[in-house]
Structure formats: structure tokens, C-alpha cells
């Protein structure tokens, strides 16, 4: 972004400077070549929860835009949604898991008594299923009782991971839209359903009103060319994509996959890829409805029987008759190309999905492992278990290695038991876990301890995610994980020991979205912003600088506190940022302005990442950029946030020669004049810098005045009563 330009996190606008890059990445191996063509985007600042919709005469739309059009509410006749629009959505289904009870408490706390549509809601218990404490069992019982009392579909602990159930049981269907209060809702895109994460407050709003708000992200098109070599899987593809395009190319985008390479991908591989588009930084990962997907649903229909309420002949015939496809000429912000034929078994880490190596390369480094994991909504499906079983057949897990296996659902486990794969894994020395999330979220048996190295077929390897912060975690396919468990170190499966290491090529060429630019150019943002009663016209304080990019939600609010529903505001304030900097609490005070780097708040959907900051008395966070989920949590919980990359760069320059501090009191002061839409920063030597930013409109202000989305919903309910 050009110096001095910025935008408000609730708005997407300002010109993104043209970028042409030709580079090589020596660390990126396995003969992969990648091309990306990135379009220059211009968005106009829209300050409220609604904006003017595209008024063109049937403009070409992407698959994402078409699905949103189908589920958007109160759109004027003959108006077509597009990327950048704020819309009110009424998703077909909304899933929540162990956080269902906090959602229920929010729901009841806002004065709601009966859910708007009990056929819209799904409750599953999957995260902490190994925890048999009285408190957890009581919470699980509360969730079950609430669901049954409201007539909500409920799946108990042991039935499986919610995302897998959503797919198995047809809550996520082609051409539909489903959301969940979990960051891996992207998974549903593997079956052509637009899946995107929401947070707990959004879920409570949907329970009460059937609706919430969403801004359609910029949309990226990923062309998968070539055929995937035999022995590789979707995990190798998504790990490779995360490593090849590791400069936030698709951050906060909706992704659509297409290309000849789709024919070589099973539906389970597509689900794996869609699942980990979350770690790639995207808000959704959507595959098209094609013949392979329709054939998969025919098999599901045979398995489930003719009378299933969602997967039935009538539904499938309707999908076949009118599949939702992208229009010719639909605009995509980015075009990425990946040649599948050049891939080999891939490994990400340690402790980052952006660090890539081929398994063959790491094998030469003799990286000994202590634990291996085949679990999660990423790779706990039947084909994953089969790949691992084939790899370990007739062999034994290495001495000193613990190999944990858990199916994504009870249906998957039963099928693996029936075909013998489950017993094969047990015979090799694997330790089985109940169907659920477990070690992937850092809960239950088998967590990584200080100094240990683990390799996992899960989706997230943030430091401390799967146990100790002093452990190292790598991610890979089930075949690589199983082979490594047998070898006692990270290795490539048989047949890939001599994978050739070549340099990838990346070519980025920006384009201009003329359709958006022409619309945007007619809309001015120079007028003063009206301030509603109760909203401050000035927000000011001293800047505290946490100089880190990709500061994730585990760093802001540790996962071990996420499911403690009884934690107080004061306790939240004490643990805020402790995984990032244990000194944060001592260095900050009420009314400070927190400034951090780029992609702030990446990671899980836990809204405590926002509420913990508020608990410390910090009213405003400024970042180079924000994770979209954190942006939602900010809006929904009345934490102010401004995206101002130029300020971040100026702070980095100013303190470049000083000793490193994770949390720095700068002596700089920031003042946001909401009425004039300006931010002024005064340095410690009284130099001033100012930026014009986008307006914060009355609709968003009203959320803050009501204390967030929850308060707004409560107000709406009281009006209807």
C-alpha cells in the first residue's frame, strides 16, 4: 500500500500498489513450479453493515458470489452482489461444537427464548471429548439438554468431529452456504458448499434471528493443472500451496479451485485442501460441482438410504439440474496456477505452515520424532486411515515413538474396522483415540512435551498448539506421518526417497478490477462522519508496540483457557498476550493503544482474542492488517480496530536500532478523530504524522454503542417484543 494510505478494518478500499515480482525460493523443493497472477484491486470504503450493491445488468459472477446471492437477505430486485459488499446472510446451516454452551448463554443472555429455525442449527461435541471432569461433563449435558429442548440436531461426544458430520450428514451440500463457530468451516468447500467461519456472537445472532452479516471477500481462482502423482494426496497439495505462496497472497480471500487437475483428486482430498485453506489465510476454499462430486453423492445416497432428510434423490436431482458454476468473464482478484505433476510428499514446519520442505529433503537431516498423529478434521477420513495402514502393514512403530490415531467420525472408524485398516494400525503399535479433535487443539492424551518433536496429519502447527511451546511440530500427509512413525524420524514414503529438488518460479502480474474501480470512483468519502449518541468522537492514547507479524490467537489468548467458561474478566486481562510476551501485563495500562504488525489475530475463531484485549482496558488495536476472523470479533465485541500499515513501518524504522522488546512503550501518542476520519500520531519528540482514513458509519457505530452484536440483537429482540 502506498505510503500514507490506509483503510479501516471494516472497509476495503484504497489502491493497492502494482507489484511485479519474479523470484526463486531455494527452500521450496520437489520439482514444483508455481505461477500466480495477482490483480490490483480497488475497493470503496463502506462504513456500515450495508452498502450499495452492484447495479450492473446481470454482471458475470463467481461461484462464491452466486451462492452468496442465493443466501443474502433484503437485496433489491435485479441487484447482484459482488466481492466487497456487506450483506446480511441467512445460511442454510450453522454448526457449533463444544462452544455451543457459551453460544447458548449468549443466546439466552440477549433475551431470546426460542431459536429462530431449529432446522438451521447443528450442535456437535468434538473438541474436549477425552475430558471426563465434572465441569466438562456438566457442560456437555447442558448443551445436549438445550439442543433437545429446542429440537436442534445434536451429535454427542464420540460421534465425530463437527465438520466431518456436516459433510457426512448433508448439512453441507453443493451450492449451499453453511457456517460454523470454528475456523475450519472452510472444509465444506470440498463438496461445493460455501463454508466460512463465524464467531460465537455471530452464532448467537443466527440462533436468535436466522441471520448475521458478512463482507464478501476478494476472490482468488486457483488453477490446478497436471495430474497428481500416484501416492500423493490433498495434504501434499495444500502444504505445497501454503509453502509456495507464503507471503499472504490469499489472505482474507475466498478461493475457488478449478482446472484439469481436479480429475485426479478424490473428494476426501478436496476436503483436506479446503480444510487447510484456513491456514493458507483464506476465508473459504470452494471446489466446483462436477461429475466426480455428483458420483460421490450417489454413493452417499446408497449408504444413507432413500429417506435421508438432506441427502436424497430429490436434492441430488436438483443439484444436477442446476449446478452453480462461475460465469465467463467473472472477475477474480488473483489467479494462481499450481502444476500437480511436479509435487512430491510435502512437510510444513517446524511450527509454521509457511515453512516448506519435501519429505525427502528432511529425511537427509535425520530429524528424530517422539510423537506422530493421524487425527483431525483434516486427515481423519477413511482414505487417510487406509494410506497410513498400507504404509505400516507388517511393520512396527519405532521404539520410543508414540503414534496416535483417531478417526474423524464414528462412521469412519466403523468402516476402517470393517476393512481391517484399524486393526492394521493397532497391530503396528498405534494408540487409538476417540473420534474428536484431541491433540490437534492441545487437549487430551499425547500432547507434545518440552523438547519433543512431533509430526502430524493435522492442520495447524503454531508454537504451543499441540502442547509445549518448547516442542517442534511438523505437518504432513498420513503416508508421511505413518512412514515417520515406523522410521522414528521424518522420512518420505517408499517410492519418494529420491525426489528431485528444483526451484519454484513465481510470477505476479497485477491487474485492475475496472468494474469495481469505475463504481468506486463515483463514491466520495471526504464528508464528515456523523456521530451517533454514545459513540466517542475522539479515541486517543499512548502507543504500545508489539512488533510481530502473524500474531495469532494462541499468542493473544492461550488455547488452554478457551473452554473455561467460568473465567472472569480480570483473569482474562491477566493472561492476555501471555503466549506472546509474559511481560505484556506489566507493560500496558488502561487506555493504551495497541499497535502490532501484519495479519494480526490469525488462527482460530476464539472471540476471547478480542475480549481479552478489551479486558485490559485497551479500546483500540492498530495493525498493518488483520485476520478477517479477528476483524469479525472486533466488530462483534466492540473492540475498535484500524488498519494502518504505514504507521507500523514508521514504528519499525524509528526503533530499528534499539534493543528488541516484544512489548514496547513508545512514548508516541495516537488520536483518532472519528468525525473527520483522521488519525494523528505525535512522536516522543513532538513530530506529527496524519492519515486520512475511511469513515466509520452509523451502522457500525450502533454495534459499539450496543456493546457489540450481542447487544444489538438484544435490542432488536426487545423491539420485536
Curated annotation (Swiss-Prot):
Cofactor: [4Fe-4S] cluster
Single annotated GO MF: homoaconitate hydratase activity
Function: Catalyzes the reversible hydration of cis-homoaconitate to (2R,3S)-homoisocitrate, a step in the alpha-aminoadipate pathway for lysine biosynthesis.
Pfam families: Aconitase, Aconitase_C
Similarity annotation: Belongs to the aconitase/IPM isomerase family.
Top EC category: lyase
EC number(s) given by UniProt: 4.2.1.36
Pathway assigned in UniProt: Amino-acid biosynthesis; L-lysine biosynthesis via AAA pathway; L-alpha-aminoadipate from 2-oxoglutarate: step 3/5
Disulfide partners: none
GO process annotations (BP): lysine biosynthetic process; lysine biosynthetic process via aminoadipic acid
Keyword terms: Amino-acid biosynthesis, Iron, Iron-sulfur, Lyase, Lysine biosynthesis, Metal-binding, Mitochondrion, Transit peptide
Signal sequence, start to end: none
The organism's place on the tree of life at top rank: Eukaryota
Reactions performed catalytically: (2R,3S)-homoisocitrate = cis-homoaconitate + H2O
Keyword Membrane belongs to the record: no
One GO CC term, this protein: mitochondrial matrix
Name the UniProt record assigns to this protein: Homoaconitase, mitochondrial
UniProt-annotated location(s): Mitochondrion
Amino acid at each position: 500500500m502506498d505510503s500514507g494510505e490506509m483503510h479501516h478494518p471494516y472497509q476495503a478500499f484504497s489502491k493497492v500498489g502494482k507489484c511485479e515480482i519474479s523470484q526463486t525460493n531455494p527452500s521450496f523443493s520437489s520439482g514444483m513450479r508455481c505461477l500466480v497472477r495477482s490483480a490490483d484491486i480497488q475497493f470503496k470504503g463502506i462504513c456500515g453493515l450495508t452498502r450499495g450493491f452492484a447495479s450492473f445488468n446481470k454482471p458475470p459472477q463467481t461461484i462464491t458470489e452466486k451462492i452468496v446471492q442465493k443466501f443474502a437477505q433484503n437485496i433489491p430486485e435485479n441487484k447482484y452482489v459482488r466481492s466487497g459488499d456487506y450483506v446480511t446472510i441467512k445460511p442454510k446451516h450453522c454448526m457449533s461444537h463444544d462452544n455451543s454452551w457459551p453460544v447458548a448463554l449468549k443466546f439466552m443472555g440477549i433475551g431470546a427464548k426460542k431459536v429462530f429455525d431449529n432446522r438451521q442449527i447443528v450442535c456437535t461435541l468434538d473438541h474436549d471429548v477425552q475430558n471426563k471432569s465434572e465441569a466438562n461433563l456438566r457442560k456437555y449435558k447442558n448443551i445436549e439438554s438445550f439442543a433437545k429442548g429446542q429440537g436442534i440436531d445434536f451429535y454427542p461426544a464420540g460421534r465425530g468431529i463437527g465438520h466431518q458430520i456436516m459433510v457426512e450428514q448433508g448439512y453441507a451440500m453443493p451450492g449451499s452456504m453453511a457456517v460454523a463457530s470454528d475456523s475450519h468451516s472452510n472444509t465444506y468447500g470440498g463438496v461445493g458448499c460455501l463454508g466460512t467461519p463465524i464467531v460465537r456472537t455471530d452464532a448467537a445472532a443466527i440462533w436468535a434471528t436466522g441471520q448475521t452479516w458478512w463482507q464478501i471477500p476478494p476472490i482468488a481462482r486457483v488453477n490446478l493443472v497436471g495430474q497428481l502423482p500416484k501416492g500423493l494426496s490433498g495434504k501434499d497439495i495444500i502444504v505445497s500451496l501454503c509453502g509456495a505462496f507464503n507471503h499472504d497472497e490469499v489472505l482474507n480471500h475466498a478461493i475457488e479451485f478449478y482446472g484439469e487437475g481436479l480429475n485426479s483428486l478424490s473428494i476426501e482430498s478436496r476436503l483436506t485442501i479446503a480444510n487447510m485453506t484456513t491456514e493458507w489465510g483464506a476465508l473459504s476454499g470452494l471446489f466446483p460441482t462436477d461429475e466426480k462430486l455428483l458420483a460421490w453423492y450417489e454413493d452417499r445416497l446408497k449408504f444413507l438410504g432413500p429417506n435421508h432428510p438432506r441427502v436424497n434423490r430429490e436434492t441430488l436431482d436438483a443439484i444436477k439440474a442446476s449446478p452453480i458454476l462461475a460465469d465467463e468473464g467473472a472477475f477474480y482478484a488473483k489467479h494462481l496456477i499450481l502444476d500437480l505433476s511436479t509435487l512430491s510428499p510435502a512437510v510444513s514446519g517446524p511450527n509454521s505452515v509457511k515453512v516448506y520442505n519435501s519429505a525427502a529433503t528432511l529425511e537427509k537431516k535425520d530429524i528424530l520424532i517422539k510423537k506422530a498423529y493421524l487425527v483431525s478434521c483434516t486427515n481423519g477420513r477413511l482414505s487417510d486411515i487406509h494410506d497410513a495402514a498400507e504404509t505400516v502393514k507388517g511393520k512396527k512403530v519405532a521404539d520410543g515413538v508414540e503414534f496416535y490415531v483417531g478417526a474423524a467420525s464414528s462412521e469412519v472408524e466403523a468402516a476402517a474396522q470393517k476393512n481391517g485398516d484399524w486393526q492394521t494400525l493397532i497391530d503396528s503399535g498405534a494408540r487409538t483415540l476417540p473420534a474428536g479433535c484431541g491433540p490437534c487443539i492441545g487437549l487430551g492424551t499425547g500432547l507434545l512435551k518440552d523438547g519433543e518433536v512431533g509430526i502430524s496429519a493435522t492442520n495447524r502447527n503454531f508454537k504451543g498448539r499441540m502442547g509445549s511451546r518448547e516442542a517442534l511440530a511438523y505437518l504432513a500427509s498420513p503416508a508421511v506421518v505413518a512412514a515417520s512413525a515406523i522410521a522414528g524420524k521424518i522420512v518420505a514414503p517408499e517410492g519418494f526417497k529420491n525426489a528431485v529438488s528444483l526451484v519454484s518460479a513465481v510470477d505476479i502480474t497485477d491487474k485492475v478490477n475496472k468494474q469495481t474501480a469505475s463504481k468506486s470512483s463515483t463514491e466520495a468519502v471526504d464528508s464528515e462522519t456523523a456521530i451517533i449518541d454514545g459513540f466517542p468522537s475522539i479515541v486517543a492514547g499512548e502507543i504500545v508496540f508489539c512488533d510481530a507479524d502473524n500474531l495469532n490467537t494462541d499468542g493473544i489468548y492461550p488455547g488452554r483457557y478457551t473452554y473455561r467458561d467460568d473465567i472472569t474478566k480480570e483473569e482474562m486481562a491477566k493472561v492476555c498476550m501471555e503466549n506472546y510476551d509474559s511481560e505484556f501485563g506489566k507493560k500496558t495500562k488502561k487506555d493504551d493503544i495497541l499497535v502490532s504488525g501484519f495479519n494480526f489475530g490469525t488462527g482460530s475463531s476464539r472471540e476471547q482474542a478480542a475480549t481479552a484485549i478489551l479486558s485490559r482496558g485497551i479500546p483500540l488495536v492498530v495493525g498493518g492488517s488483520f485476520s478477517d476472523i479477528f476483524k469479525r470479533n472486533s466488530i462483534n465485541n466492540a473492540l475498535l480496530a484500524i488498519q494502518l500499515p504505514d504507521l507500523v513501518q514508521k514504528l519499525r524504522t524509528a526503533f530499528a536500532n534499539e534493543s528488541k522488546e516484544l512489548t514496547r512503550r513508545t512514548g508516541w501518542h495516537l488520536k483518532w478523530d472519528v468525525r473527520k476520519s483522521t488519525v494523528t500520531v505525535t512522536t516522543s519528540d513532538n513530530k506529527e504524522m496524519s492519515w486520512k482514513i475511511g469513515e466509520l458509519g452509523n451502522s457500525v457505530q450502533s454495534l459499539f454503542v450496543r456493546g457489540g452484536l450481542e447487544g444489538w440483537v438484544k435490542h432488536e429482540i426487545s423491539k420485536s417484543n
